[in-house]
Amino acid sequence: MAGQLNCYLQDNLLVNPFQSAYKTGHSTESALLKIKSDIHLSLSKGHSSALTLLDLSAAFDTIDHALLLERLSLEYGLSGSVLKWFTSYLTNRRQSVKIHDTLSSERQLLYGVPQGSVLGPVLFTLYTAPLSKIISAFSSLSHHLYADDTQIYLDLTPNTITSSIEQLQKCLSAVQSWMAENKLKLNPDKTEFIVLGTEKQQTKLADHFPIDIMGNKFSPCSKVKNIGVIFDSTLSMSKHVSLVCKSCFYHIRDFSRIRRLLSKSVAVTLANALVGSRLDYCNSLMHGITKKQFRRLQAIQNTLCRIISHLPKRASTSHARKLLHWLPVEYRVKFKLLVITYKALNTQQPPYLSACLNEYSCNRSTRRSNPNNKFLNIPVYTHKTHKSKRHFDCSFEIAAPTLWNSLPLHVRTAPSVISFRSRLKCHLFSLAFPP
């Protein structure tokens, strides 16, 4: 049923383009990549940005069944036996709690979607879809949703900060009113607000804070945790790199204690699960970080490689990593970003990233203008400062086509995602470990 519902929503263009949860071709990484890219482009113009992260209290447990069914009927066109099926699915559910050998009496569930179900999360996104319409009514604000995580961000300049903050406050007031009407509750204690920009910009804007949001005073945080990724106030990703290093080395210590008990193949599998997954989580957002930060991340992979291969503490790991078929961390970042680019170009998913990419076109006949070569257009930087140029280069609109155009033709023209990943890894492997 979940598959049929998703197909129906897509075929009838009823999918919320700003919601990235529970949708094919979408992920936390694609959502964060879009948000981070938009903010980088704002900073590249010499502006600063404000990002507000909204938190809902027990969001999946407070959905009103009657309101949800009404929304499915009026806004999504479900009727007849289909609507009756959803009514039967949601209503007359009962729940009890068992502690040791004691079972409580049953109570009927009047609110919430079934926990652990496939349909529950999809129904939640449909229930909260009107949030996008409310936020979109404020033209100076941008937003993105991932399940119950709502993010609102906007440009700030010294000339427009007062009006921009007023728009944000009005928007949040409208969001809060809608949530109250729909049995949802914002959690002000976990709502976070951060201003992103240079230290000089933040000093100039300091007089405008704290601001009043939903009756609470908010001063900008120095960092926020955004769907598992740390955004610091300069968007340097240094805080996130530190978090990744701390988490990875914690698991490496545990791994080193049991390595002697494991075969090499099991050790590699466990290392990838415990440490590799943390290195690779949303790692496309690492594009553009400093060489020093990449060295810190590479040290994790090197240490892990030495433990697996029983190498001395200071031994070189280049040959061992080559035998393990491990790309260096910096190349893994490029690999992930290029795979996302390939999917955006060839599947048009997610649409908000696909819209950032344009094929190269030129009136003159050149090698790049040949559509068979699949080159992408790279926007030209028109501002002056070096610091702003860094942000420009870090945006998806610039980083993706720059990396894409550097690939050999046989990689760019791969017929499938599987083929592209294979050819891309071979190409990057040859660059990382030249013969």
Regions found by a protein language model. Name each.
Residues G3-P435:
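Hydrophobic/basic alpha-helical segments
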